[in-house]
Amino acid sequence: MRQSRRASSRVNRLVVIFIIVASGFLLLYKNTQQFTQIDRECIQDEWQENNNLGNTIDDGSNFRIAFTDIQQNYTWLHLPNFLENSEILMIVSSNCDNFARRNILRKTWMNPENSQIIGDGRMKALFLVGINGADEKLNAVVLEEAKVFGDMIVIDLEDNYLNLSYKTISLLLYSISKTKSPNLIGKIDEDVLFYPDQLTPLINDKTINTSTFSIYGEKYEAGVAVNHGEDNAKWQISKNSFKCSVYPSYLSGPTYFLTRKAAKRIVEATKHRKFISVDVEDVFITGLLAGDVGIKKNQLPFMYMIEEATNDRESYEILAWHTKKRDQQYIEAFESLKLNRCKSCRKSKNPDLEELKEK
């Protein structure tokens, strides 16, 4: 009886081992099949020469963004005074009506008292804001805010999801045409909890190498499926805009960093692709355009671009966390996590932040 049980136990172990090994091979097979040579050729085939089409360009007070199938002209409504002494430029993509969140960011990570890299002048932080075409009073308030704080770029682009790719290209164009000193450019959304001082060791140890053609952030490997409308989801891409079934590798959109060299190449590459007018600007810019011009895509540590990827109670370091925290929660999380999840942060408390928390 015991021998029978032992034999049965051995068989069960062998079955478990077989299942584990088979699952491993199946997973490996799936991963190797996600992005094939056919997929790569499809993406390359979408690229168009367009030698007769003008580039995306800054004309001084106006600028032009050119894609293969559509070209748009915009105006710089307000430009901040930029002192050429910062090597890093962070630009927050901000909705025009989010006055409260901009003030929260000014009091938290954008404040020199909270970020030594900003206090030392090594980093400059600005907002990029569009307009609301149906609300002239709101636009007037935005322009007044820009004059008062001096940290806003305002353009006459309608602030909505369909224009995200235009807005990000505008961000990159400003960075390479209106400034000279920054050799690292960061694009960040206003709902990201960010600790700028965490960049210092990453730059110092060459994890981020500003002399290369590179982008850095949370990387998704090639093979993510394209939604061509099969499941009636909110965000779909027509096959006329992009016919391929999967995307190349790309960086998650809420926060990523580009060397100046990479940003320049990406801006120059826009005219070679059709405009994709849905909320996949990260794929479009860091995946397709960056891939077209040979930009290296790099994974950075301490990046959490999915809300569930981390929480307030874990012990991992944080550089950037895309979180849904409301204004008061954002302030509290920034202050508490600064103490235990940001080794590079200054330890001094900010009296302005304490006052804001009390309100």
Curated annotation (Swiss-Prot):
Q: Where in the cell is it found?
A: Golgi apparatus membrane
**BP-aspect Gene Ontology terms:** protein O-linked glycosylation; response to toxic substance
Query: What does the record note as the disruption phenotype of the gene behind this chain?
Result: Worms exhibit resistance to the Cry5B toxin produced by Bacillus thuringiensis. This is thought to be due to mutants having reduced population of glycolipids which are targeted by the Cry5B protein.
**Which Enzyme Commission numbers does its entry carry?**
2.4.1.-
Topology, Lumenal side: 30-359
Q: In which pathway does it act?
A: Protein modification; protein glycosylation
Membrane: present as a keyword of the record?
A: yes
Q: Give me the glycosylation sites of this protein.
A: 73, 163, 209
| Record membrane topology | Single-pass type II membrane protein
Transmembrane region(s): 12-29
Any ranges marked Cytoplasmic in the topology annotation, and which? Answer: 1-11
> InterPro entries of this UniProt entry?
Glyco_trans_31 (IPR002659)
According to its UniProt record, which protein family does this protein belong to?
Answer: Belongs to the glycosyltransferase 31 family.
> Could you tell me what this protein is called?
Beta-1,3-galactosyltransferase bre-2
Q: Which organism is it from?
A: Caenorhabditis elegans
